[in-house]
Amino acid sequence: MRVAILYICTGKYTVFFKEFYESFEKNFLPDIEKTYFVYTDRKKLPYSDKKNVCLIPQKNLGWPDNTLMRFALFSREEERFKDYDYTFFINANFLCVKTVTAEEFLPVKENLLVAEHASAHGKNPKDMTYDRNPKCRAFVDWDEGSVYVMGGLNGGKTGAYLDMIHTLRDRVDADKKDGIIALWHDESQLNRYIIG
């Protein structure tokens, strides 16, 4: 089994990669082959000489495009990881501080995995910060949604994940053509997709 980890570190976010890599190598799916696909504006990073680290040149797009355009970045390079069993995007500033096993983490019956946003836990769905703009493709109506998910950790079986990033890339592109940016960028688009 092989797992692809998609990681964006441009600009100031490059400082996180060393600790990220060390913690994920030690604790995240320790018995499974992992490859880190690192989108970066640097020619070299700590551990970039490792066989399981693949640097992908990516200029710093600035705010909010560094997050908003991630689905386009991933789909542009999908040939690199399309044959992996699972693919996950994980935020640059995450650390894996305890052992996480395949049995605990990898979706088996489901195709995708997302994580509830800590700030939304236990909230009434009407109080969650879904995008409420009906012109936006991330729009969530007031009677929809029950859990608000974070944009910083998502993935699953690679085929299903690629389907998701293609859909979200297309929605973001269509919104941009209409002069619209979702409230919380990629996270708003992800929430709309997960709700259905």
Predicted feature locations:
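Hydrophobic/aromatic beta-strand patches that form the interior of the parallel beta-sheet core
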Residues: F37, C54-I56, F88-I90, L112-V114, ...
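Catalytic core and acceptor-binding pocket of nucleotide-sugar-dependent glycosyltransferases
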Residues: W142-G196
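Conserved core of the sugar-phosphate nucleotidyltransferase
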Residues: G122-R132, Y148-G152
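N-terminal anchoring/stem segment of glycosyltransferases
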Residues: M1-N66, E77-D83
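Short, flexible, basic/aromatic active-site loop/helix in glycosyltransferases
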Residues: Y130-S146
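A conserved donor-nucleotide-binding helix/loop in the catalytic core
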Residues: Q58-I90, L183-Y193
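GT-A fold catalytic core of metal-dependent nucleotide-sugar glycosyltransferases
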Residues: F71-N124
